[in-house]
A protein has these predicted regions:
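Long, well-ordered core segments of solenoidal/helical folds
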Residues: 49-71, 105-123, 154-173, 213-239, ...
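C-terminal motif of bacterial Sec signal peptides marking the signal peptidase cleavage site
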Residues: 24-25
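Bacterial N-terminal signal peptides that target proteins for export
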Residues: 2-14
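Acidic/His metal-coordination segments adjacent to aromatic residues that form catalytic metal sites
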Residues: 67-70, 115-122, 173-178, 242-256, ...
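Aromatic- and glycine-enriched pocket-lining scaffold segments that form the walls
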Residues: 173-239, 248, 263
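Inter-helical turn/loop segments and adjacent helix faces that build the functional surface
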Residues: 199-214, 273-285, 338-346
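Oxyanion-binding "anion nests"
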Residues: 267-316
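CBM-like carbohydrate-recognition segments
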Residues: 40-85, 97-104, 113-131, 137, ...
Length: 421
C-alpha cells in the first residue's frame, strides 16, 4: 500500500514535471515569437512601411485603424451601410494588383460578417427604400464572382428587388429615400448606379438588360436636366420635384448650395458606371460628355495655390469655408481615371495631379509608426431630417470635421491606384 502510494506520487510528480516542461516549452515558444515580432517591428520601425506606394500605405493604415472592414467609417457594431464599400473597392484593386492575401481576406470577412447563411443582410430593411444601401452590393458582386456562395447571390437578388420597388419622381428619377419623397440627391447616383449597372452586366440578359441600361443612363440625363446650374457648370446637392421642402427653391425645387462631396459623388458615379455600361450603348457618349463639362466646372473652382477644393465650392473666401478632403479626393479620382480610360484628354491630368499633390502636401499626415492619416474630412451632410438640415452655407461649414473618414480615404486609395498605373 505504501509502495502504491509512492508510485502514485511519482506518477503525479512525473506528470507535473512533464507538464512544467511543456509549459516552459510553450512559454519559450511564445517568448520567441513575441521576441521575433518585436524585433521585426524594431527593425522596420513602422507598422505601415513607408517604402510602399500611397495606395497601399493608406489601405494598410485603414486596416490598422479598423481591423475589421465593418468598422470602417467608425461603426460601433456591424451594420449594412455604404462607406465600407468605397475602401473595399480599393482593397479589391490592390489584391488584383499585388496578390496579397490580406487584402482579399479583409473583403471576404466583411461579407461573412454582414451576410447570414440564408442570405439575409444584417441590419438591412428593404422597406426603407434607401438608395445608400445599394452601394455595398458592389462588394457582394465581387465576392460572389470569386466564391460563388449562394448566400451572396440571395443578398444580391434582394438588393436588386429594392431597385424594382424604389419610388421615383414623376419623370422616373429614383427618390433618395422613401422618407424623402420626390427628392433626387447627387449622392444617390453613386450609391445606386454603379451597382445597378454592374448587376445588370453580370446577371441580366436581352431586353431586360437593354431596359435596365436605358434606365441607368436616364438617371444621369435627368440629373443634368434638373440639377445643373448653367452659369457655373456645377450641380446643386439636391432637387425636390414637389418643391415642398423648406430647403427647396419654390420655383426650381433646388437646394441652395454646391456642396463639394455631392459633386464628388456624382463624378465617381459617372466614371464607375462606364466600367459596366456596354461599349455600344448610345448613352456612353452622353455620359462621357457630362464628365467633360463636369471636369471643366470642377477645375474652375480648384484653388490655384493648394490645388484643393472647398466644402462649399463656389464660396472659397466666405467665413468658415475650408479645403475639404473627401471632395478633393473624389474630384482627383474622377479626373485621373477619366484620363486613363480616354474619356478626357491627357491635358486634364495636370489638374488632377495638382489636386493629388495638394492632398498629400496639405491634408496627409504620417504618424511615427508609418500610419497615414487623411485630415479635414466632412463627416456627414444631408438635407431635411431631424434635426432639420436646411442646406444653407452655414449648415455645410458647421458640420463635423474629422480625420480618416472612409468617404475620403477610399477615393484617395482609388486615385492613388490610377496615378500608379
Amino acid at each position: 500500500m505504501t509502495m502504491s502510494f509512492i508510485n502514485q506520487k511519482l506518477k503525479i510528480y512525473a506528470v507535473a514535471v512533464l507538464g512544467s516542461g511543456m509549459f516552459l516549452a510553450c512559454a519559450q515558444t511564445k517568448t520567441t515569437v513575441a521576441s521575433k515580432t518585436s524585433k521585426e517591428t524594431s527593425q522596420s520601425g513602422k507598422v505601415v512601411p513607408t517604402n510602399l506606394k500611397w495606395s497601399e500605405r493608406m489601405m494598410l493604415s485603414e486596416m490598422q485603424r479598423f481591423p475589421e472592414a465593418w468598422m470602417l467609417d467608425f461603426s460601433k457594431s456591424p451594420k449594412w451601410t455604404y462607406p465600407s464599400a468605397i475602401v473595399l473597392d480599393g482593397a479589391e484593386q490592390l489584391y488584383i494588383k499585388t496578390g496579397k492575401q490580406e487584402y482579399y481576406d479583409y473583403i471576404s470577412e466583411f461579407g461573412e460578417k454582414l451576410i447570414k447563411e440564408d442570405g439575409t443582410i444584417l441590419t438591412y430593411d428593404i422597406e426603407k427604400y434607401n438608395i445608400d444601401m445599394l452601394n455595398s452590393g458592389n462588394v457582394l458582386l465581387y465576392l460572389y464572382e470569386k466564391e460563388k456562395k449562394e448566400k451572396y447571390l440571395k443578398a444580391l437578388q434582394t438588393l436588386r428587388l429594392q431597385i424594382d420597388g424604389q419610388p421615383r419622381t414623376n419623370e422616373g428619377s429614383f427618390w433618395h429615400k422613401k422618407i424623402y419623397p420626390y427628392q433626387v440627391w447627387l449622392d444617390g447616383l453613386y450609391m445606386g448606379m454603379p451597382f445597378y449597372t454592374h448587376y445588370t452586366k453580370d446577371f441580366t440578359k436581352g431586353a431586360d438588360a437593354a431596359k435596365a441600361y436605358n434606365d441607368i443612363v436616364f438617371q444621369f440625363d435627368s440629373v443634368q436636366k434638373n440639377l445643373l446650374d448653367k452659369k457655373t457648370g456645377l450641380l446643386y446637392h439636391a432637387w425636390d420635384e414637389s418643391k415642398k421642402e423648406a430647403w427647396a427653391n419654390k420655383e426650381t425645387g433646388l437646394s441652395p448650395n454646391f456642396w463639394g462631396r455631392a459633386m464628388g459623388w456624382y463624378g465617381m458615379a459617372m466614371v464607375d458606371v462606364l466600367d459596366y455600361l456596354p461599349e455600344n450603348h448610345p448613352g456612353r457618349a452622353r455620359i462621357i460628355s457630362y464628365i467633360r463639362s463636369y471636369s471643366d466646372a470642377v477645375i474652375k473652382y480648384q484653388d490655384k495655390k493648394s490645388g484643393l477644393w472647398y466644402q462649399v465650392l463656389d464660396k472659397p473666401l466666405a467665413n468658415g469655408n475650408y479645403e475639404e478632403a473627401t471632395a478633393s479626393a473624389m474630384f482627383v479620382y474622377t479626373m485621373i481615371k477619366s484620363v486613363n480610360k480616354g474619356y478626357l484628354p491627357k491635358s486634364y491630368k495636370a489638374a488632377a495631379k495638382k489636386g493629388y499633390d495638394g492632398i498629400i502636401k496639405n491634408l496627409i499626415t504620417v504618424d511615427e509608426n508609418g500610419v497615414v492619416n487623411l485630415n479635414k474630412c466632412c463627416a456627414v451632410a444631408g438635407l431635411g431630417g431631424k434635426p432639420y438640415r436646411d442646406g444653407s452655407y452655414e449648415y455645410y461649414v458647421n458640420e463635423e470635421i474629422r480625420s480618416n473618414d472612409g468617404k475620403g480615404t477610399g477615393p484617395f486609395i482609388l486615385a492613388s491606384l490610377e496615378f500608379e498605373k
